[in-house]
Amino acid sequence: MSESIDHNRRHFLGTAAMTIAAAQLGILGGAKAQSLQTARLPFEGDLPSLGGATAWLNSSPLAASHLRGKVVLINFWTYTCVNWRRTLPYTRAWADKYKDHGLVVIGVHTPEFPFEHNIANIRWAIKDMEINYPVVVDSYYAIWRAFNNEYWPTFYFSDSKGHIRHHQFGEGDYQQSERVIQELLAEAGFRGVSDDLVSVDPRGAEVAADLDNLRSSENYVGYEQTANFVSPTGTRRNKSHGYAYPAQLGLNHWALQGNWTIGKEAIALNQAAGRIAYRFHSRDLNLVMGPTVQGTSVRFRVGIDGQPPGSTHGFDVDAQGNGTVVEQRLYQLIRQSSPIADRQFEIEFLDSGLQAFDFTFG
């Protein structure tokens, strides 16, 4: 990666954490922002340039002159981030509802994993996820740094004069965000748009997390970031090694079986029939993974508590647990119904040539 990024930044931020993070961002404008604290939407600084883009997708490049007189919503995203995926139904709906009423939505794709630098992968994600608004590719973090941004996802709301007036870190607060859009449009003189709020029907990985039943947190499987890896021999860094399961797994512990190489950011399967087991407590279990060589595919089979998943299968798996890794992306493998309990997940790969990066839950 071109820049070291704190992977934990993608997690949803609570109210206190958002306040602390906002104070750390350069866009807050110091004394100027403080002098306008009584305003409903204070000035937080000027909208930074998007000139550091690697490429533009869904649009020709949009300079400041193109955005003058428009309300602009900037959304930092990376396509494997499940927290961002859960915000996407709202962003799509806002872009569609307000596009003819003065709003320009721009997605800034700043990659987390190495394969997310690949523009072909970003193009695939845009098409698969039905993103029709402009996307600026920020592969070298130039725009990320210009905004002093720290999180996926983040939303910045700019008025028609190019001033940032509001920001949202992480998921949630969708009604407030849409009211901000409406207020900025009204302030700019745009009329004739309904003040009703959008209604969305999220599917698959876009469904909001079940926070009441979430007892497992994101876990990267590369040695730099992973936690609770309990195969008996421990980690053999950057070496092909035969791993085995322990006698049992505790909650949020995971293990490997078969011949794997554990790298800094990912694990790679060297021989067919390799397995990963993970004991978890959540409605959803997702895994970011992909073939080691693009253009190939890897078959897999998922189980839960030693049985096919049946009705608990995720969007990318059938009831018998069968699926195929084709793209480098997030795969939703388990979606349970209530009651949620501690469960043991296992995935067996029937072919070699697989890389796995990150477990997420929801």
Feature locations, PLM:
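Structural microenvironment flanking redox-active thiols in thiol-disulfide oxidoreductases
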Residues: 85-128, 139-143, 298-300
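N-terminal secretory signal peptides
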Residues: 1-11, 18-21
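Short active-site neighborhood of thiol/selenol oxidoreductases, capturing the structured segment around
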Residues: 63-82, 105
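N-terminal "domain-start" segment that seeds a small globular fold
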Residues: 34-65
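Non-catalytic, surface beta->alpha helical segment in thiol-disulfide oxidoreductase systems
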Residues: 164-185
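Short, internal strand/loop/helix patches
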Residues: 120-158, 287
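Loop/turn elements at helix/coil->beta-strand transitions in domains of secreted/extracellular proteins
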Residues: 69-72, 101-104, 131-133, 160
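Non-globular targeting/processing and membrane-anchoring segments
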Residues: 14, 40, 45-51, 178-362
